[in-house]
A protein has these predicted regions:
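Membrane-interface helix-boundary motifs at transmembrane edges
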Residues: 34, 116-125
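Small-polar-interrupted transmembrane alpha-helices in polytopic inner-membrane proteins
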Residues: 46-54, 125-147
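Interfacial helix-loop-helix junctions of multi-pass membrane proteins
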Residues: 82-98, 139-164
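N-terminal signal-anchor transmembrane alpha helix
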Residues: 38-65
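Hydrophobic alpha-helical transmembrane segments
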Residues: 44, 96-115
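Hydrophobic cores of alpha-helical transmembrane segments in multi-pass inner/ER membrane proteins
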Residues: 105-111, 162-179
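Extracytosolic (periplasmic/ER-lumenal) interhelical loops and adjacent juxtamembrane/interface segments
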Residues: 62-96
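Short, highly charged, low-complexity non-transmembrane loops/tails of multi-pass membrane proteins
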Residues: 181-198
Length: 198
């Protein structure tokens, strides 16, 4: 129901109570666009904090060992942090390995440019084959290394991770925003219909 209404031109003549349905669509859609922008900015802000933490862990190691180890501990839940597979900064390894750093860098860049190349209220995802193609290099690099067929190097780990993270963002973000805002549209429309029927 929601997809159908949001994709239709504003030419509907049906009404909800005394209010033209087109006007309600415009009202709900306007509120939805604002909420999408807020949610996007919140997600971007939280991810920036997460991304900065990758650099804070090595930076604080010689200044506040406890806090540094705490940050390393947090990132250890999502990354193996192997020294030989990590970049070093401030004379210490980063909070995540080179591949994970590439993934998160790709995600961050994707989030920053996303509003300039796609509307935030466009919840459609690109063709799945783009995602498959983007994940393939990382999959091949990681799998061949895991099987002992070859040893990768940090630059390749970063590049393959970056490609995967950048492209994956264009699938994850619209789905996430779509789920949140479609629920809001249903609630708004149902509430208005109920109020006008009294």
């Amino acid at each position: 129901m929601c997809d159908e209404y949001l994709n239709l031109p504003i030419e509907i003549t049906r009404t909800i109570g005394e209010i033209p349905f087109t006007e309600k669509i415009k009202e709900v859609y306007s509120k939805m666009k604002k909420k999408i922008s807020y949610v996007y900015l919140i997600i971007l802000f939280l991810f920036l904090i997460f991304y900065i933490g990758i650099f804070l862990a090595p930076y604080l190691y010689d200044k506040n060992r406890f806090l540094s180890l705490l940050i390393y501990g947090i990132y250890s839940q999502i990354c193996h942090q192997m020294p030989e597979r990590s970049y070093y900064i401030f004379n210490h390894k980063m909070g995540v390995c080179a591949r994970c750093f590439g993934i998160y860098t790709g995600v961050l860049l994707g989030m920053l440019i996303y509003p300039f190349i796609r509307r935030l209220d466009n919840f459609k995802t690109p063709n799945k084959w783009y995602l498959i193609l983007a994940l393939t290099p990382m999959g091949i690099d990681g799998t061949t290394q895991l099987l002992g067929l070859r040893e990768s190097f940090n630059e390749l780990r970063f590049i393959t991770g970056f490609i995967a993270g950048f492209v994956a963002l264009f699938y994850i973000l619209p789905v996430f925003l779509g789920v949140i805002n479609k629920e809001k549209v249903f609630i708004e429309m149902k509430h208005t219909s109920h109020q006008k029927s009294k």
